[in-house]
Amino acid sequence: MDEARARDVLTAAGLDGGEPAELLALGENAVFAAGDLVVKVGREAALLERAERELAVAAWLADAGVRAVRAAEPAARLVDGHPLTVWHRLPDAVRPAGPEDLAALLRHLHALPAPPFTLPARDLLGGVERWLRLAGEAVDPADAAYLRARRDAYAGEVAGLTPHLAPGAIHGDALPRNVHVSPDGPVLVDLETVSYDLREHDLVVMALSRDRYGLPAAAYEAFTRAYGWDVRGWDGCAVLRGARETASCAWVAQHAPANPKALAEFRRRVASLRDGDPEVRWHAF
């Protein structure tokens, strides 16, 4: 799904309004700002269930007093084969979100009891096949086969982990980019990966950011201080990190057919995994 296709879906849904909607992000979802609303258009119909669950999560967090994005419509729509959800637009951010902002929201989320509906386990590796399928012939078949084999190996290892923290609700993609600092304080956004699983999933993300994406050591230390624990001291950290690296690498593949920079970054990531080099920096594209 490219931007033009996503805009066609907006038009079909009657949400393009008078002013052209502003594209905020384009990945598995196209995210648009349309007046005082934010509209998320999913890549394919198979993501409808996830969109519906994200709305249920938002309502649950509102009831629990967690500062998180709020839905403007209670149900997801399916428009021309694409799931679509509508959200209240947040005020402009007063500053970039920091590690401490994320840690505080995670502490609140991780303290909650289970919601009154079933959350899935964090299927960290579940998107690998879909992303590689979307990549098609743009990526080397040997690289795709390598990632599939790596996925299968890590799936078994993750299933056998013994957690340090009590399992429960997690965000699933816990990064500062998924926190919006509004005038009233930090707000958790992008709730589609909220799951019920090892709390360590949410903490390994920042550890990987330190090692792969250039997060300064001081920023990572601020995160662990604010949360109260450093996941790197846990025996299972390397396994969760390896699984997330596999997923993060495959995620880039879906963008390779239309984006030469994404293809170059995909190749870079695969090479670093093949070489077993944990210090090669990964980049946005």
Where are these regions (language model features)?
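Conserved NTP-binding catalytic cores of kinases and kinase-like/nucleotidyltransferase enzymes
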Residues: M1-V69, P183, H283
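A conserved alpha-helical element in kinase catalytic cores
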Residues: E3, K40-D80, D92-A111, G214
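Active-site acidic catalytic loop and adjacent metal/ATP-binding pocket
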Residues: A25-V39, A71, A155-L203
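A short, glycine/Asx- and small/polar-enriched loop/turn
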Residues: E28, A33-D36, V79-P83, A243
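Short pocket-lining segment of the protein kinase catalytic domain that shapes the ATP-binding cleft
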Residues: L84-D92
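A cross-family kinase active-site recognition segment
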Residues: A93-A145, L165-P167
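ATP/Mg2+ or Mg2+-diphosphate-binding catalytic cores
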Residues: R130, L134-A138, A142, A250-F285
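Active-site activation/catalytic loop segments of kinase-like enzymes and analogous catalytic loops
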Residues: E200-V231, A243-A258
